[in-house]
């Protein structure tokens, strides 16, 4: 599933081609995504795209009439293409622009979403209760310590909780905990402030580096230009269960935590 870096890379790739462009059509070939795609052609045709933003793993395409809320789901991608590009399997939606280009949404598994919001986006049910963005000052050790106070849940589950901090999915939670030397099953509320300080710094550094590398391509993700992300070449633990630790040489352990595969080093990462 595309995580925050992959969504941000997509935003950076499509924004220069969308901002200040006029929408001339919205073609919906298959509206049966995670939620039914609303018929918003009347609202969006003729509108000028003002900006393309990201909130958590959602892309927000703003016009004066409202905002398209796009989620890539498990396997979705957005690409800027010439308007006459042949339609391929799983090309479900085209946002057609007056400049002869289209924004094409492809999603083989159809767990993605394309929704519409005429309210301020912070009022939308999907966005209203989200936690802070990890690459902003709002995500800091004081905020994290307060959010974790008294929690008995495993720290990895808390790190992936969008009410605590957004956009840190399975890949980057594994990597950040390894870099911080924290066992993924450590009780969140008992981690001291010094270790939380390191964890916050590692989350920020790893996400920022992943964005610079174009995200992580494991199976489905490609950038807006169709190229893969290269952060997979930098992974220390994710997807490496049973292999040797890059730090100490110990065999990495693999468990299921919150129904997600979790990989860690039992020597380098402590509770």
From Swiss-Prot:
Obligatory cofactor(s): Zn(2+)
Catalytic activity: Hydrolysis of DNA containing ring-opened 7-methylguanine residues, releasing 2,6-diamino-4-hydroxy-5-(N-methyl)formamidopyrimidine; 2'-deoxyribonucleotide-(2'-deoxyribose 5'-phosphate)-2'-deoxyribonucleotide-DNA = a 3'-end 2'-deoxyribonucleotide-(2,3-dehydro-2,3-deoxyribose 5'-phosphate)-DNA + a 5'-end 5'-phospho-2'-deoxyribonucleoside-DNA + H(+)
ZnF (FPG-type) residues: 236-270
Record text on cofactor binding: Binds 1 zinc ion per subunit.
Keyword terms: DNA damage, DNA repair, DNA-binding, Glycosidase, Hydrolase, Lyase, Metal-binding, Multifunctional enzyme, Zinc, Zinc-finger
GO biological process: base-excision repair
Recorded GO MF terms: 8-oxo-7,8-dihydroguanine DNA N-glycosylase activity; class I DNA-(apurinic or apyrimidinic site) endonuclease activity; damaged DNA binding; zinc ion binding
SUPFAM superfamilies (UniProt xref): Glucocorticoid receptor-like (DNA-binding domain), N-terminal domain of MutM-like DNA repair proteins, S13-like H2TH domain
InterPro entries: DNA_glyclase/AP_lyase_DNA-bd, DNA_glyclase_Znf_dom_DNA_BS, Formamido-pyr_DNA_Glyclase, FPG_cat, MutM-like_N-ter, Ribosomal_uS13-like_H2TH, Znf_DNA_glyclase/AP_lyase, Znf_FPG/IleRS
Active-site residues (renumbered): 2-3, 57, 260
Positions bound to DNA: 90, 109, 151
EC number, as in UniProt: 3.2.2.23, 4.2.99.18
PANTHER family the record matches: FORMAMIDOPYRIMIDINE-DNA GLYCOSYLASE
HAMAP family named in the record: Fapy_DNA_glycosyl
Cited function: Involved in base excision repair of DNA damaged by oxidation or by mutagenic agents. Acts as a DNA glycosylase that recognizes and removes damaged bases. Has a preference for oxidized purines, such as 7,8-dihydro-8-oxoguanine (8-oxoG). Has AP (apurinic/apyrimidinic) lyase activity and introduces nicks in the DNA strand. Cleaves the DNA backbone by beta-delta elimination to generate a single-strand break at the site of the removed base with both 3'- and 5'-phosphates.
Subunit structure: Monomer.
UniProt similarity note: Belongs to the FPG family.
The protein's name: Formamidopyrimidine-DNA glycosylase
Underlying gene: mutM
């Amino acid at each position: 599933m595309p995580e925050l870096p992959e969504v941000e890379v997509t935003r950076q790739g499509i924004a220069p081609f969308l901002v200040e462009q006029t929408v001339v059509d919205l073609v919906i070939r298959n509206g049966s995504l995670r939620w039914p795609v609303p018929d918003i052609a009347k609202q969006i045709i003729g509108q000028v795209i003002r900006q393309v933003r990201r909130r958590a793993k959602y892309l927000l395409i703003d016009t004066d009439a409202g905002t398209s809320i796009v989620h890539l789901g498990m396997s979705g991608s957005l690409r800027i293409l010439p308007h006459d590009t042949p339609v391929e399997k799983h090309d479900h939606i085209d946002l057609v622009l007056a400049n002869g280009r289209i924004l094409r949404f492809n999603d083989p598994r159809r767990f993605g979403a394309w929704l519409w919001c005429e309210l301020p986006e912070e009022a939308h049910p999907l966005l209203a209760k989200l936690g802070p963005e990890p690459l902003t000052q709002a995500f800091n050790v004081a905020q994290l310590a307060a959010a974790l106070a008294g929690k008995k849940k495993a720290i990895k589950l808390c790190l992936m909780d969008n009410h605590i901090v957004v956009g840190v999915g399975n890949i980057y939670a594994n990597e950040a905990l390894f870099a911080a030397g924290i066992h993924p099953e450590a009780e969140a509320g008992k981690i001291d402030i010094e270790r939380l300080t390191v964890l916050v710094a590692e989350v920020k550094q790893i996400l920022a580096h992943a964005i610079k590398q174009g995200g992580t391509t494991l199976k489905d993700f490609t950038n807006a230009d169709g190229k893969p992300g290269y952060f997979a070449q930098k992974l220390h633990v994710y997807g490496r269960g049973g292999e040797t630790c890059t730090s100490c040489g110990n065999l990495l352990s693999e468990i299921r935590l919150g129904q997600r595969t979790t990989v860690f080093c039992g020597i380098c990462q402590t509770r």
